[in-house]
């Protein structure tokens, strides 16, 4: 096998060009086995195998610097740069992350995981090279929907100013996570149809040279094209037409489903762990589709991640024009929602916590200053969410809860979530965000009659004395567990509070607690600095009330173990009880 002998790019160059397809097949075989056991980004990597081989065959990495956008398609790159064992040996599968990481290899230049950044990052590398009078090629790889992001277009716009070596590989697989949307992709389709000869050419209009490669999964054709642009003296785009999921029939047929996979059976392509349990995505989709049937002003908006809201292809078709995918463009999604709301519509925007940070300015400026009554639901905003350092979901509380006018809610159950949606989608007074709980969805069958328009009214779920435990969202269950343990171990009947509101204080209730409580505990699924608990502590600052804030430390974590992180932050019922008894 060729792959077993490759310890770096120099070994790729030793293989004859007509033998490189064998290497490509070996890479796919290894990726297939690994993905079937470990899961990971599937389609993007299968489509980039030949291009990755060609890049390392032609260029001199790491002197020539290759920057991958999102870097979810960097598995073949890692296999060719000294990390093959992480893809060949099951015991080493976790030796590498799912994205590029400079701590792993000198061939990786950035830790990235968000989209549309490679052109700007690589342009910075090229600018520094020029300032220092150095040489070498700088290559940005982008595609798989990433061109719909504003930063990608900003980067392309700037790239033409460089007037020096800068190579942009556009991996055009005619897909994002789902299908592509927007006029830009109509131009890419036209270029594919005309073999790159169409007069209307986005890249040329930006002042960039342009090369088209129709056979983007033909390693010989790619090597020829890359050799032509190597050592170029001005920015050039190499537009390659690839097939997402190439080499595995189920992935070629169902590209959206196979963008990312969990463990599966190789023969059938069926998941090994098929989750049939109801979750917040399916609940959201069902709710919105029903609402759309009765109200034509309701619109569901996504920024390239439709299934986060449960909108699979069939559901998107059912929603018709009341479902909008703006591409991977969170800023536009939020601004669009504001415009819809101002003109009398009822916009719903669903977004991962990790991605909402990309549109902080629009939430603040376009929505909250204008007091636009949008509904924005935050998914995976939890320590139980995605655990890659680039996709952490526990920074949204400090980020969103301190924006004026925004009402940020935290349900603990399905029923509370649906009640919040009922209120938010019909009210016209506030911008509303809802932070969904992490972990399995809890449904207790209760009927929630609370009027969420009466802002900042907490709910006392259990009346006690001496100690009050306020459990926000995900950690309301932890609050109940800690209270139960306190009763069992110390005979203390604690008050348990579900606050619902992240953005405001129930000052009347907090004041009342002073009468027969001396300790207040806050539990939140997010970082403590600037978070919910600090607001409670500040309220009690001049009093004798002891306040104990529990949440996460401000730090970047990567591929962490949830239980270990919870214990490290004393976020277990046993630790909370031990702490409070130690100061009582």
Regions found by a protein language model. Give the residues of each.
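Active-site nucleophile and cofactor-binding loops and adjacent substrate-binding regions
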Residues: 39-48, 67-72, 101-120, 142-146, ...
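A glycine-rich helix N-cap at a beta->alpha junction
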Residues: 86-96, 161-175, 368-380
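Non-catalytic terminal/interface segments that mediate subunit docking, oligomerization
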Residues: 248-357, 362-372, 470-473
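N-terminal amphipathic, basic-rich helices that act as targeting or association modules
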Residues: 1-79, 215
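Peripheral docking tails and interdomain loops at the edges
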Residues: 263, 269-274, 385-387, 398, ...
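Cofactor-binding active-site loop characterized by glycine-rich and histidine/acidic residues
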Residues: 41-162, 298, 303, 312-313, ...
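Glycine/charged-rich beta-loop-alpha catalytic/anionic-binding loops adjacent to active sites
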Residues: 29-36, 95-111, 133-139, 312-327, ...
